[in-house]
Curated annotation (Swiss-Prot):
Chain residues that bind substrate: 86, 90, 161-163
Pfam families documented for this protein: OpuAC
UniProt GO molecular function: quaternary ammonium group binding; transmembrane transporter activity
Annotated signal peptide: 1-21
Protein name as annotated: Glycine betaine/proline betaine-binding periplasmic protein
Function: Part of the ProU ABC transporter complex involved in glycine betaine and proline betaine uptake. Binds glycine betaine and proline betaine with high affinity.
NCBIfam families found in the cross-reference section: PRK11119.1 (NF008334)
Cellular location(s): Periplasm
């Protein structure tokens, strides 16, 4: 008798599980995530992918492309979503690829992302440097010369990144092009050189953003300091105001990151659209994960493990997102 009860219970569980799986909104639908070539974006992308899998979707490995290509792929429907839309940094690319007519963007995935220019604290204190405009002085600029040409060397952005245009625009607006060189290339490799210079006690001058591992390695306020700018200046926005409530101006507004999806796809998939709108990830959690990657735990398997760990530590929140998304399908 006991065996038959156990069998009946197991059979009922199997049937309900199969029925539930068949009822999931994503059954039979494949999702193609897209991100940039920055591997530190994989963590947040995979977190969204995991939640989509719980809705029944088959989610492919993220494609890694330049941001411009990513937005074009999303607009055409070749890609389904990206978890790394920066506002306002990517606004020009977003609009150029079709804007709100082509894209679905609701909610805020990550709040409080910062970016700007930093120098080592030792040099800042010694020469009383607080503002990037001080580098108009050739004597000050020369402190950050790494190749002997007399100009300050700024560790800057990869070609094609949103920050590239902003930096070039600001160097021109602040009349720094004669005394500052914007060095571009592989950002991670350039920053590794910059950090080596710092460890040798040499002055450093670089652009960075959070969330990213750099500020775990060179801590603002302790090792390095943010430089202010003389006035707000962003490309394509004459009315840009990057001044903070306390009057400080670091040249960039505090950014937000969003999940952006192909609009037509999102309209046909209300559960996924709801998920994209409600997921939220603290910037500190991304910084912490990026730091672990920088310490050597950066393989595909490692990052999957970081996602597992985050979900386990926030299971109730994660399940809440999934359940709320499922309710939107009904």
């Amino acid at each position: 008798m006991r065996h038959s009860v156990l069998f009946a219970t197991a059979f009922a569980t199997l049937i309900s599980t199969q029925t539930f799986a068949a009822d999931l909104p994503g059954k039979g639908i494949t999702v193609n995530p897209v991100q940039s070539t920055i591997t530190e974006e994989t963590f947040q992308t995979l977190l969204v992918s995991r939640a989509l899998e719980k809705l029944g979707y088959t989610v492919n490995k993220p494609s890694e492309v330049d941001y411009n290509v990513g937005y074009t792929s999303l607009a055409s429907g070749d890609a389904t979503f990206t978890a790394v839309n920066w506002t306002p940094l990517h606004d020009n690319m977003y609009e150029a690829a079709g804007g709100d007519k082509k894209f679905y963007r609701e909610g805020v995935f990550v709040n409080g992302a910062a970016q700007g220019y930093l120098i080592d604290k030792k040099t800042a204190d010694q020469y009383k440097i607080t503002n990037i405009a001080q580098l108009k002085d050739p004597k000050i600029a020369k402190l950050f010369d790494t190749n002997g040409d007399g100009k300050a060397d700024l560790t800057g952005c990869n070609p094609g990144w949103g920050c590239e245009g902003a930096i070039n625009h600001q160097l021109a607006a602040y009349e720094l092009t004669n005394t500052v060189t914007h060095n571009q290339g592989n950002y991670a490799a350039m920053m590794a050189d910059t950090i080596s210079r710092y460890k040798e006690g040499k002055p450093v001058f670089y652009y960075t953003w959070t969330p990213y591992w750099v500020s775990n390695e060179l801590k603002p306020g302790k090792d390095v300091v943010w430089l202010q700018v003389p006035f707000s200046a962003l490309p394509g926005d004459k009315n840009a105001d990057t001044k903070l409530p306390n009057g400080a101006n670091y040249g960039f507004p505090v950014s937000t990151m969003h999940i952006v999806a192909n609009k037509a796809w999102a309209e046909k998939n209300p559960a996924a659209a709801k998920l994209f709108a409600i997921m939220q990830l603290p910037v500190a959690d991304i910084n912490a994960q990026n730091a672990i990657m920088h310490d050597g735990k950066a393989s595909e398997g490692d990052i999957q493990g970081h996602v597992d760990g985050w979900i386990k530590a926030h299971q109730q929140q994660f399940d809440g997102w999934v359940n709320e998304a499922l309710a939107a399908q009904k």
